[in-house]
Structure formats: structure tokens, C-alpha cells
Swiss-Prot record:
Chain residues in the propeptide: 452-473
Keyword Protease: no
Domain EGF-like, chain residue ranges per copy: 364-442
EC number: 3.2.1.35
Family to which the UniProt record says this protein belongs: Belongs to the glycosyl hydrolase 56 family.
Catalytic activity, as annotated: Random hydrolysis of (1->4)-linkages between N-acetyl-beta-D-glucosamine and D-glucuronate residues in hyaluronate
Protein name per UniProt: Hyaluronidase-2
Functional note: Catalyzes hyaluronan degradation into small fragments that are endocytosed and degraded in lysosomes by HYAL1 and exoglycosidases. Essential for the breakdown of extracellular matrix hyaluronan.
Gene: HYAL2
One function term, GO molecular function aspect: hyaluronoglucuronidase activity
């Protein structure tokens, strides 16, 4: 009898371990319901009427969301609140003049909160539909030590304000008090802002642009030894912001590539570790779920209009998809649409390179979700540092023109082969959406919620043990 139960117990233990190592569930996708969203947030609406070079509308349908960061656009699926669009954000302007108190402890949180309703209502005018809301406050950072270089003005003024009140204090005491006052006020400004806007527009996912960051820009000084890894001290500092992650409902890191990193493994490592850090933060600071991560990138290299190479499309969009991000937001400013020539270059790049890659990755992520996760989760690379991507297999699929007017210019034709499914099984696992569980997101936790969640989990494990016993006795 006991020898017969040996393999059953072994199998049951394997199943229990697999259950225990399940990824935390995350928010289901918004917009189109796809597991990986690609959004276009570039003010290209000017290319047609102003420069007589409109982008191909069928190319633009490849994106799940289209928006513009320009001032005149409201009620969009993606809304970016720059510093002058949300309340009274204390900061110093480009000429060094104090605005709204300069430093957070010198600003009026009460007046700031009083103004939020009108500003949010102006840009997001209705509760529905759900969308992304990104607060872009970049002038100071809530962790004192991170206010280096041109941001040191916030530390200097903070020390000055304390020294005025306590002229007899030694510099060390002044600095310590200044840090406390700055960090406390910064925290209050960010926390209370999030709490207010979440209550006012609860269907939107809210977070701060560039949070978290991992400060892995040392490729300029250390090209030969650069790994892309986030310094341990910066990972620790991100954990000091647990209060921010707990209040956020989405994370919005940035992976803009400098041309220095073009078509290099350094570029891929730079992106990969930034996204991995965002996913780590998204996972560890919530007990029962992981926050969705939407990665900001650009269709071009930073500070220019040169389109990303194929390798760098893979290193940015492809890497984000394979690691398990909820999506990418392709952002650009008015520099993309200053003339007929800039619009033409962008239009050609979209048709030639960007749109075919976006269609490929979007559909590959969708097929993986269907095949691996029953459509109730997204595929996540088992080994974050592996060189495996969510790409349609060239032996099973091809992109063909779509002639339907309401569809993107390209669509995939083909189906997953046995080899494709085996590859996905080997290299990717599922992160289920909230309400679903199991290795392949096959268990409807909402249906099982008639009993306590603990009782449901227990009955599930009991079932696994029973199956194992039946199989080996």
C-alpha cells in the first residue's frame, strides 16, 4: 500500500509546489482586452491638416489606443497630467523661480487638493470608460538623496528654511530636519493627490510617470563593464517608497533609449532591468495582487527623430511584452510633427518597421494567452534574462494585408503548431487576471467564492491529491 502511494505523494507535492509558486494575479486588461496593449501617444493629428501628410489610418489601427499629449485634447483613454495641469504642484521653473512655494513643505496641500477636482474634471470628463491616468511630476523626487545635480535646489532651500527658524542649530541637525520635513511633505503631496483622484475617477488606473526608476544610466562612464542591473542601493530606495506603491493602481516606468545604446546588448539590458524592477515593485508591495505595469518608450531614440532599429524594437516593445508588462505607451512630443518632412519620415517608419512589429508582438501575446492561459492571463517569461520573445513563428504565420476598412493594414494568417505550443510551454508561464487561478488560469475563483478562499484552495489541493492517488493505485 505505502509503495503504491509513493509516486502519488511525489506527484501531489509537485502539484502543491507549482500551486504555491503561482504568480500573483493582476488587473485584467483594459481597452481592447488584449494581454499586451500598445498605445500611441504622439501629437500626429497635426500631420494631416497642418502639413498635408496624414498618417495611414489603417496603420494607426494597429495600436490599441491613440491619444495626444497636447493641451487641447480631453477625455482620452490615456491622460498625462503635467505639472501645470494638476493642482498646485510646488517646484522651481526653468529660470529658477519658485512656483507654489518651491518645495513641498512650503506649498499649500489644502489649496492644491481644492483645485484637483476642477483639473481632473477638465481632462477626464466622465467616469467611463476606464483609462490610464499618469501624473508627470519630475521636478523633485520624494527620496531626499535622489535630488542630485539640478534638483539639489530642493535640498538647499529645505536646509535654508530650517536654518532661518533655527539659526543656532549646527549644520548636521539642520540637514537632518530639512530631510525629514521635505520627505514628509513630498509624501503627503503625492499620497493625498493619489487618494483624491482615485476616489474621483476610480475606473482609471493611476500612477506617477518614471516610478519606479532604477538609475542604471552608468553606461556612459562604464561602457566596458556595463550590465544594466539596477544598483542595490536604488532597489532599496525603491522599497522605501512602499507607501507610494501601495496607493498606486498602475506603474509607469520609462525606457527611453539614447542613440548611444542603439542596436546593442547594452540597450536591451538597460531596458530589461528597468522593466524587471518595475515588475518586482508591482509584485512585492501588494499582498494579494500585482499592479499592472505600462512601460513608456518612444518610437525613436531620445533627443532625435531616428526610428528605433529592429533590434531596438525587440529590446523595448518585445522585451516588455516577454517580461509580462501590461503594455507599452509610445510617447512623443510636438517635435515629431513640425513639418511635412518630419511627418513623412514618421509615416514611412510606421509602415515599414513599427506597425509590422507591433502587429506581430500584439498577436503573439494574444495567441500565447489563448493557448497557455485560457485567455484569462498573460504570458510571462519563465527566466527573465532569457533571450525568448513573444513573436509569431515564421514557419506558422505570415502577416497579410487586411482589406476590411475597420481593421489594421496587416493581420496574421496561420495557427500555432505543436512546436509553437511546446516552445511557449517551455519558456513562458501564466500570470492570471484577478478572479482566475491555476497554472493555466483555468480555475474561476469568482465562481468558487461561495465558500471562503481558503476553503476553495484547500478543496482544490484535496482534489489534486485524490487524482494523484487514483492515478498510482
Amino acid at each position: 500500500m505505502w509503495t503504491g502511494l509513493g509516486p502519488a505523494v511525489t506527484l501531489a507535492l509537485v502539484l502543491v509546489v507549482a500551486w504555491a509558486t503561482e504568480l500573483k494575479p493582476t488587473a485584467p486588461p483594459i481597452f481592447t482586452g488584449r494581454p499586451f496593449v500598445v498605445a500611441w501617444d504622439v501629437p500626429t493629428q497635426d500631420c494631416g491638416p497642418r502639413h498635408k501628410m496624414p498618417l495611414d489610418p489603417k496603420d494607426m489601427k494597429a495600436f490599441d489606443v491613440q491619444a495626444s499629449p497636447n493641451e487641447g485634447f480631453v477625455n482620452q483613454n490615456i491622460t498625462i497630467f503635467y505639472r501645470d495641469r494638476l493642482g498646485m504642484y510646488p517646484h522651481f521653473n526653468s529660470v529658477g523661480r519658485s512656483v507654489h512655494g518651491g518645495v513641498p513643505q512650503n506649498g499649500s496641500l489644502w489649496v492644491h487638493l481644492e483645485m484637483l477636482k476642477g483639473h481632473v474634471e477638465h481632462y477626464i470628463r466622465t467616469q467611463e470608460p476606464a483609462g490610464l491616468a499618469v501624473i508627470d511630476w519630475e521636478d523633485w523626487r520624494p527620496v531626499w538623496v535622489r535630488n542630485w545635480q539640478d534638483k539639489d535646489v530642493y535640498r538647499r532651500l529645505s536646509r535654508h528654511l530650517v536654518a532661518i527658524r533655527h539659526p543656532d542649530w549646527p549644520p548636521e541637525r539642520v540637514a537632518k530636519e530639512a530631510q525629514y520635513e521635505f520627505e514628509f511633505a513630498a509624501r503627503q503631496f503625492m499620497l493625498e493627490t493619489l487618494r483624491f483622484v482615485k476616489a474621483f475617477r476610480p475606473r482609471h488606473l493611476w500612477g506617477f510617470y518614471l516610478f519606479p526608476d532604477c538609475y542604471n544610466h552608468d553606461y556612459v562612464q562604464n561602457w566596458e563593464t556595463y550590465t544594466g542591473r539596477c544598483p542595490d542601493v536604488e532597489v532599496s530606495r525603491n522599497d522605501q517608497l512602499a507607501w507610494l506603491w501601495a496607493e498606486s493602481t498602475a506603474l509607469f516606468p520609462s525606457v527611453y533609449l539614447e542613440e548611444t545604446l542603439a542596436s546593442s546588448t547594452h540597450g536591451r539590458n538597460f531596458v530589461s532591468f528597468r522593466v524587471q524592477e518595475a515588475l518586482r515593485v508591482a509584485d512585492v508591495h501588494h499582498a494579494n495582487h500585482a499592479l499592472p505595469v505600462y512601460v513608456f518608450t518612444r518610437p525613436t531614440y531620445s533627443r532625435g527623430l531616428t526610428g528605433l532599429s529592429e533590434m531596438d524594437l525587440i529590446s523595448t516593445i518585445g522585451e516588455s511584452a516577454a517580461l509580462g508588462a501590461a503594455g507599452v505607451i509610445l510617447w512623443g512630443d510636438a517635435g515629431f510633427t513640425t513639418s511635412n518632412e518630419t511627418c513623412r519620415r514618421l509615416k514611412d517608419y510606421l509602415t515599414r518597421s513599427l506597425v509590422p512589429y507591433v502587429v506581430n508582438v500584439s498577436w503573439a501575446a494574444q495567441y500565447c494567452s489563448w493557448a497557455q492561459c485560457h485567455g484569462h492571463g498573460r504570458c510571462v517569461r519563465r527566466d527573465p534574462n532569457a533571450h525568448t520573445f513573444l513573436h509569431l513563428s515564421a514557419s506558422s504565420f505570415r502577416l497579410v494585408p487586411s482589406h476590411a476598412p475597420d481593421e489594421p493594414r496587416l493581420r496574421p494568417e496561420g495557427e500555432l503548431s505543436w512546436a509553437d505550443r511546446n516552445h511557449l510551454q517551455m519558456h513562458f508561464r501564466c500570470q492570471c487576471y484577478l478572479g482566475w487561478g491555476g497554472e493555466q488560469c483555468q480555475w474561476d475563483r469568482r465562481r468558487a467564492a461561495g465558500g471562503a478562499s481558503g476553503a476553495w484552495a484547500g478543496s482544490h489541493l484535496t482534489g489534486l491529491l485524490a487524482v494523484a492517488v487514483l492515478a498510482f493505485t
